């Protein structure tokens, strides 16, 4: 791939790529079992049907892609920049018997290899923290969705109010300790996630991200904080 990759993007790929085989298991553990519930809420926002084709961006190990097919009976194209994650995802798709419904490809969200309005809906997870320009990325994502198609995202978030001190305690101390108990690689993830999440939302308040969606031509943007604010789902509809 010839396009330049941002340093934060490159660092995230180097951090997570070796963990593909264990990613889903320990993502569930480190999120206190909330990750599957968040994914289900994300998938439900699309409100689509069986005769649709959905693009799953930053698909990783294909967990969302598989859930989309099981929920809607649709077809899914999943893209991710990590060959290692895609290899795990393809194995999971085969085990699930969904190879005819799900196709996984290597691609980056900032430069999608698809024509305009190619998909009926789009999901992306844990993505915007790793791109240099959220507005440009949202425009690229919206470009490949037909007018009237749903777009939905999931990411970690920073709780407000009384939940904030507990969150800070967990990401500063709990996550690194739990990660190191699993493996050195997961220890690095545990130390990385808190500053990554906090730094992104400090630099890009949710109102700014919603503005990026609207600037990309996405209408009716809504959001829901999950698990006392530890997760965030945004969704909206591609305008005409």
Per-region residue spans from a language model:
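A short SAM/SAH-binding and catalytic strip from SAM-dependent methyltransferases
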Residues: 120-134
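A short acidic, Gly/Pro-enriched loop at the edge of an enzyme's catalytic core
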Residues: 110-121
């Amino acid at each position: 791939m010839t396009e330049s990759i941002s340093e934060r993007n490159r660092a995230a790929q180097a951090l997570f790529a070796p963990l593909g085989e264990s990613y889903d298991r320990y993502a569930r553990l480190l999120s206190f079992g909330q990750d599957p519930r968040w994914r289900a809420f994300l998938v439900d926002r699309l409100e689509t049907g069986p005769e649709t084709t959905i693009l799953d961006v930053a698909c990783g190990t294909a967990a969302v892609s598989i859930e989309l097919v099981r929920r809607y009976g649709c077809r899914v194209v999943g893209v991710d920049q990590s060959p290692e994650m895609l290899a795990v995802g393809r194995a999971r798709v085969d085990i699930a018997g969904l190879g005819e419904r799900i196709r996984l490809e290597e691609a980056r969200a900032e430069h999608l290899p698809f024509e305009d309005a190619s998909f009926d809906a789009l999901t992306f997870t844990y993505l915007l923290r790793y791109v240099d320009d959220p507005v440009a990325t949202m425009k690229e994502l919206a470009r490949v969705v037909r007018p009237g198609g749903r777009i939905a995202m999931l990411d970690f978030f920073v709780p407000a109010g009384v939940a904030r001190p507990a969150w800070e305690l967990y990401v500063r101390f709990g996550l690194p300790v739990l990660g190191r108990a699993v493996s050195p690689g997961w220890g690095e993830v545990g130390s990385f996630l808190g500053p990554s999440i906090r730094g992104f939302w400090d630099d890009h308040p949710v109102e700014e991200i919603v503005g990026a969606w609207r600037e990309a031509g996405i209408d009716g943007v809504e959001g829901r904080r999950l698990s006392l604010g530890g997760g965030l789902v945004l969704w909206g509809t591609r305008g005409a």
